[in-house]
Amino acid sequence: MAKYLGPKLKLSRREGTDLFLKSGVRAIESKCKIDHLPGQHGSRRSRLSDYGIQLREKQKLRRMYVILERQFKKYYKKAVRMKGNTGENLLILLESRLDNVVYRMGFGSTRLESRQLISHKSIIINKKVINIPSYQIKPNDCIEVKEIAKKQSRIKAAIEISEQREKQSWIDVDRVKMQGIFKKFPDRSDLSSEINEHLIIELYSK
């Protein structure tokens, strides 16, 4: 599957917000001018049309979870078929991806690193090795680092870094044992207020 190989900070600058594509050891504001577009002569942002605003919001969410357009649209279509609010359903589907849950639990310093751990068969779900980053986690699933992988320095470093991040109420984590429980799907109030999912739904509904 194709993936973006360029500078991660450039994507955050493009969207005007921290997409959490880097480890977070240093605040993104200290690494780049987040309010300027990327490029040597990056200028301040011009006024966008309604379509442009919707598109930027979609790109921001898609890049935050490191997902390509084709897969992102599949999540939208699945969210439409689910009961309840389509926008909230979309966020829940993204938030319950295995690579995101591994990141939230602190076993990977970024979602991309978490995806690598999964692909390398370093993550166990309910006592079974799962190597599919998009695997959908369900309430009460147990996620743990494979015993042989617990010695990896990058996992230990990621756990240390995760102590600086906000704790998530929908997961329980034992960072010493390197395992956690996905207690429930998050409520909308648990997730970032910087995301306006209604704009994304409006974009795809056209």
UniProtKB/Swiss-Prot annotation:
* UniProt keyword NADP, yes or no: no
Superkingdom of origin: Bacteria
Self-association state and partner proteins as the record states: Part of the 30S ribosomal subunit. Contacts protein S5. The interaction surface between S4 and S5 is involved in control of translational fidelity.
Q: Which residues form the S4 RNA-binding domain?
A: 96-158
Alphabetized Gene3D superfamilies for the sequence: Ribosomal Protein S4 Delta 41, Chain A, domain 1, RNA-binding S4 domain
Give the gene that encodes this protein: rpsD
According to UniProt, the name of this protein is: Small ribosomal subunit protein uS4
- Role according to the record: One of the primary rRNA binding proteins, it binds directly to 16S rRNA where it nucleates assembly of the body of the 30S subunit. With S5 and S12 plays an important role in translational accuracy.
The uppermost taxa in this organism's lineage are: Bacteria, Pseudomonadati, Pseudomonadota, Gammaproteobacteria, Enterobacterales
> So what family is this one in?
Belongs to the universal ribosomal protein uS4 family.
